[in-house]
Regions:
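A charge-rich, low-complexity, intrinsically flexible signal that marks solvent-exposed coils, linkers
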Residues: 1-166
Length: 166
């Protein structure tokens, strides 16, 4: 089980699988493995994807909101967000229902057995800002997580969709 972190960029949802989920603690760096771009319709999808298919399992929208690009070059000139991602480091401000404040996505090569050709490995990092936390759980519990859209848990979605356990 993992969290998908998605940002709308260039008419698609750029997507990363975040195994431990996002953290609002700046000391916690989260592995984020780039996945294929998703269509915009995935912003609202909740349901069960058949096991064995890409992304198979139960899906909820854990958080939703808007983001504001913050990336700039060394002279302080703003860098378009798509370019910042291509360059391997993008900063942004999240105004979500659950996640708030400045975050960064930083691409790196290799590490921890994830040096797979064609696989982009990133870190999702919370900035030290007024929205950061330093105590409490460092990762959302996927079994207790509730949808930002419907308030349902994974188990409720699975039961309602006839998909069994999440």
């Amino acid at each position: 089980m993992h969290f998908d972190f998605r940002l709308e960029v260039g008419g698609v949802l750029k997507s990363w699988a975040v195994p431990r989920g996002p953290s609002e603690n700046p000391r916690e760096r989260r592995l984020a493995v780039a996945t294929q771009d998703h269509p915009l319709e995935y912003r609202t999808f909740e349901g069960v994807i058949t096991k064995g298919r890409y992304g198979g399992g139960t899906v909820i929208v854990w958080d939703q909101g808007i983001y504001h690009p913050l990336s700039h070059d060394r002279w302080g000139t703003p860098v378009p967000f798509e370019q910042a991602l291509q360059d391997g480091h993008a900063t942004f401000w999240l105004d979500g229902i659950k996640l708030h404040g400045e975050f960064a996505l930083t691409r790196f090569k290799g590490g921890s057995g994830h040096d797979v050709p064609g696989e982009e490995v990133w870190l999702l990092i919370k900035a030290r800002d007024g929205q950061a936390t330093h105590d409490g759980p460092d990762a959302p519990d996927p079994y207790l997580a509730r949808s930002a859209r419907t308030g349902r848990t994974l188990a409720q979605v699975a039961a309602e969709e006839g998909g069994g356990a999440p």
